[in-house]
Design a protein with these regions (language model features):
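Cleavable N-terminal export/targeting peptides
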Residues: 1-39
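Gram-negative and organellar
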Residues: 31-498
Length: 498
């Protein structure tokens, strides 16, 4: 491999490791001094996969079957102490396609770090992610790795935040939050004609400050807040800016119900009249908690010319079955959405990186095409989770409308999916999932229906070795001629941990 090839493979890894380690080293010095309270684990691993695909080039016609060999060294590092909890997982995949004897390298990694620097006052956290993702939802997409397409590229995301909070005796409390984000991709290279779409590298800054009533105020409380979000882009396109200042009053009738309302001022630099804001805003709603099982919040208001709604519902049917649902209406960008998603991920010793619902993260790609165009995001989702001794089952549904700031219209995507993870024996497990999604693209009459299904069987051969067999199916049915796509794959997998 020439030096350019070495740099292409090594640079994302180096950036990922340097960023994660910089956060980790800085936080190590701030952690507890008692060595007995610290725990550190390092697991090296090697993985070998043999995958058989019936459409390795993800083409509509003349599908090419292929056998793909995948060798993947990796490392997992975890660290826990009284004030710091962190994890890093990184793997470099080498893929060899037997049909044309070509090779490819792919990075994947995730890092989390959470630290309480000053107890009850100052906390820091960071997230880093390396993922291979499909850039254009109109292009070639699948849920299998055993293929190659120009639509799949490495996306790097890094976020770090600091939260400072405290109180002025029992009269007032304050909270300051700052979050910085970086997004790096090859898609800002306008000279690369193999890219299906172009969009910028970004630097983002998000700041929220609030001061409110303290413990002295029981039934009646107040809060004043201000926030600013900015995204700076590398290409010559419009940057994202959104700012608010507001005052809120809350009245608690009893321990079951409370009402709240706010008024303030907002402004942004959106171009479309329906999305542009420079004036007064208001919001009103209630929170209802009749018992330990139910927590419901609903609010409505107006920002600019937009009527906005917010809702959040959590209901515990039993200790094993619960439901979480949310709906929100915000102005956002791809960078802000990614930062929010990363911030909700945590490291679980048994499941690895988990999402806000405590489930393993969904490695499927974003449901909208990457772009530099900002948008109004109306998003609703709900998840049922059932946990038993050996089995976890989930069913989830979501819908999202995105109205773009370039007057191309509104894109809509909705989907449902379900899955399970069962420990058959102490050493053997099986998990599966099935999902359906429909996407209506902005500015077009194109409608895509996407179906995917996965089934994986895993067994531990010994303390250090694990074997697995996986089946996957991906299918896209579109009303646009020549856009249908299908792939089936079988994967044999062997993993050694050292």
């Amino acid at each position: 491999m020439d030096m350019a090839g070495v740099s292409r493979v090594a640079l994302p890894y180096l950036r990922f490791v340097v960023t994660a380690c910089a956060c980790g080293v800085g936080l190590v010095e701030l952690g507890p001094t008692s060595k007995a309270s610290e725990h550190f684990w390092v697991d090296l691993r090697g993985e070998a996969r043999l995958a058989i695909s019936d459409n390795s080039l993800l083409t509509i016609k003349d599908r090419t079957p292929d056998v793909v060999l995948n060798m993947s060294p990796g490392i997992n590092v975890r660290w826990e102490s009284k004030r710091v909890r962190g994890g890093i997982d990184y793997a470099l995949d080498y893929l060899y396609f037997i049909s044309d004897k070509s090779a490819d390298y792919r990075h994947s990694g995730f890092a989390t770090i959470d630290a309480e620097v000053i107890k009850d006052h100052l906390s820091l956290n960071g997230r880093a992610s390396l993922r291979q993702q499909f850039l254009d939802q109109r292009g070639s997409i699948t849920n299998s790795f055993a293929n190659k397409t120009d639509n799949r590229r490495l996306i790097q995301n890094y976020t770090g935040s600091a939260i400072l909070k405290g109180g002025l005796r029992d009269i007032a409390d304050y909270r300051l939050t700052y979050r910085y984000g970086l997004a790096r991709t090859p898609a800002d290279n306008l000279d690369d004609l193999t890219l299906p779409v172009n969009f910028s590298d970004t630097n983002s800054s998000e700041f929220v400050a609030s001061i409110g009533s303290g413990n002295r105020f029981n039934n009646f409380s107040w809060r004043i807040s201000a926030d600013s979000s900015r995204v700076m882009r590398s290409l010559n396109v419009n940057d994202f800016k959104n700012e608010h200042i507001a005052g809120e009053l809350t009245y608690k009738f009893n321990r079951f119900i409370q009402i709240f309302g706010s008024t303030g001022y907002s402004r942004n630099n959106f171009q479309a009249d329906v999305l542009s804001e420079d004036g007064r805003t208001w919001n009103a709603g209630f929170r209802w908690t009749p018992g330990r099982k139910l927590d419901l919040t609903v609010s409505t208001g107006k920002e600019g010319q937009r009527e906005v709604w917010y809702a959040a519902l959590q209901y515990f049917f039993s200790a094993r079955l619960d439901f979480n649902g949310t709906y929100q209406d915000t102005l956002s960008s791809n960078t802000i959405v990614t930062n929010d998603s990363l911030q909700g991920f945590t490291f679980d010793a048994e499941q690895g990186i988990s999402n806000q619902s405590g489930l393993p993260i969904d490695e499927t790609d974003p449901i909208f095409t990457y772009s530099d165009v900002d948008f109004r995001r109306r998003n609703g989702r709900g998840t049922f989770t059932l946990r038993k001794k050996r089995t976890t089952f989930y069913a989830t549904g979501n819908i999202e409308w995105r109205t773009f700031d370039d007057s191309t219209g509104t894109a809509v995507s909705w989907g449902i999916s379900s899955g399970f993870d069962r420990n058959v024996t102490e050493n053997t497990s099986i998990k599966g999932s099935v999902g359906y999604r429909q996407s209506r693209f902005e500015g077009q009459f194109r409608i895509d229906n996407y179906i995917e299904a996965n089934l994986d069987w895993t067994t531990e051969l010994s303390r250090y070795f694990r074997a697995a067999i996986g089946l996957s199916h991906s299918e896209r049915q579109s009303n646009e001629a020549g856009a249908d796509l299908e792939e089936n794959a079988v994967t044999f997998y062997l993993r050694g941990t050292f």
